[in-house]
């Protein structure tokens, strides 16, 4: 399904960001340098791309459709996903706070990142392998086409066009700089 494939493609970019974040944490903990823009750039990537672009599509459009099609929120997979979105936002907030005010609190950043990385990896696994499979079973072709159109509309309305390419390139650059 096109709309689900689109969410999975965004997961791929987010997972590459997690890989780079994990390498950066290793460098931070061994007191090695990281790119100067990374302490502020990484939380920005996860807040803007993972949350405002990706999670917003899920929360505002995709999950409500799944609820209409009978997938429960309370006590079900959607409720779990929403809770994990909130926990992830808190981790990103703490990473951002660690790099504010011209000071970089390496320990605070690393601690928040080490909580965030496994949380989001497990979250993506559950969505890709459980929730999206459930969605494919309850969504019609018309639902899929409509959802894909709504994803495009949201990207246009919220000035998110080009965000995939921008952040994919930024993650690739960081990956090259953080060995």
Model region roles, listed by residue range:
Residues 1-179:
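Small-residue-biased structural context
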């Amino acid at each position: 399904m096109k709309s689900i494939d689109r969410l999975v493609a965004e997961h791929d970019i987010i997972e590459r960001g997690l890989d780079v974040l994990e390498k950066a944490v290793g460098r931070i903990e061994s007191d090695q340098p990281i790119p100067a823009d990374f302490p502020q750039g990484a939380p920005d990537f996860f807040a803007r791309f993972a949350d405002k672009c990706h999670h917003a599509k899920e929360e505002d459009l995709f999950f409500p459709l799944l609820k209409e099609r009978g997938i429960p929120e309370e006590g079900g997979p959607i409720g779990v996903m929403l809770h994990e979105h909130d926990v992830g936002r808190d981790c990103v907030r703490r990473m951002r706070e660690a790099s504010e005010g011209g000071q970089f609190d390496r320990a605070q950043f690393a601690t928040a990142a080490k909580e965030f990385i496994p949380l989001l990896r497990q979250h993506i696994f559950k969505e890709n392998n459980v929730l999206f499979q459930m969605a494919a079973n309850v969504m019609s072709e018309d639902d899929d086409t409509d959802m894909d159109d709504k994803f495009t509309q949201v990207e246009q309305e919220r000035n998110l066009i080009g965000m995939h390419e921008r952040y994919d390139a930024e993650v690739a650059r960081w990956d090259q700089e953080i060995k």
